[in-house]
C-alpha cells in the first residue's frame, strides 16, 4: 500500500509541475498554444484563438451582464533569404453576447500588420498594431479581466492598439546587449467621426532592459491633434493642439513571482466618461499610477492584487478629479495550458459627486467570472 501511495504522490507532483511549466510558458508567450498549420520551405503559418465566456455582476447597468466573446488570429512568416524574413499577423474579435439578428455588430479587427525582419538589425512593420507606449503599459495589464485602463486605451493615439502605425523594433540592441530592446514609431493622421478616437501625425519611442527577471523601461509619444479635437474644447474637453504621453515602469518576473508598477502622465489625450452624444471626454492632463502583484502556485492557481489610479488635472470648473481609482482582487486557475477559469473583483474607490454625475464616470464595483479556452 505504501508503495502505491508513494507512486500516486509522485504522479500528482509530476502533473503539478507540468501544469506550472505550462502556465509559465503560457504567460511568457505573446501568442500561446498556436496551432501550426503549415511549416515548409521557409514558410510558416500558426493559427491561434480563444473563447472567453464571462459574466459581469454590477449595479452599473452599462457593465452588468454577459460579456462573452471569441478571438481568432494567425501569425505567418516567410524566409526570404538568410538575412531577411517577412511576417504578418491578423486578429479578430467576435462578440458572443449579441443576438443573431444583430449580426456582426461590434465585432472588430484587433490587429492587422505586415513587415520585414532584417537579422540583428531589427524589424519594420506597418498596419494596425500596438502603440509603443503600450510597451510599458503592458507590464501592469495582466489582471484576470480588468486593469491597464488608467492611460492605455484602444485607438487613443499610441497608447494601445491603434491604426496606421509604422514601427521599427530592435531586440537585444543589434544582437550586442541581451535584454536591451528599443522601438520607434510613426502614426499617420486618422480623422474619424468620434473626436476621442482621432489623431494627427505623431511619433513615439520606447526602450526596455530586462536582466534575470528584473525589468525597467520608459516610453514617450507626441502627436498633433485634429482640428475637430481642438474645436471640441469645452468645460471637460481638452483644448491643446498636441497630445503627449510619457511613461516609466519597473517589473520583476521570476521564481513564480510577478511584480510590476508604472507611472505616466498624459496631455490632451486620455479619455474618460461620456457626453450627451455618447462620446468620451478628453482630459487636459492626467497623472496615472498602476501596481500589480501576482504569484503562480505549482498546482495552477494564480492570485492577483492591484491598485490603479488616474488623476485628471485642470478639468474646467471641476478642477482636479479622480478619473479612475480602484483595487483589484482576482485569481485565475489553470486546468492546463488550454483551459482556465477566473474571478476578478474591481473595488471602485470613486464616490458619487457632481463631477462623476456630469461626466458619467462609473462609481460601481464589478465582479467578473468566467471560463477561458484557448489554443
UniProtKB/Swiss-Prot annotation:
Main location per the UniProt record: membrane
Induction comment from the UniProt entry of this chain: Expressed in high osmolarity conditions (at protein level).
Keyword Repeat appears in the UniProt entry: no
Consequences of knocking out this gene: Slight decrease in virulence in male BALB/c mice.
This protein's record includes keyword Transport: yes
Location relative to the cell: Cell outer membrane
Residues spanning the signal sequence: 1-34
Membrane-related topology note: Multi-pass membrane protein
Annotated coiled-coil segments of the chain: none
GO biological process: monoatomic ion transmembrane transport
Entry function: Forms pores that allow passive diffusion of small molecules across the outer membrane.
Subunit structure: Homotrimer. Mixed heterotrimers with other porins are also probable.
Protein's recorded name: Outer membrane porin OmpD
Gene behind this protein: ompD
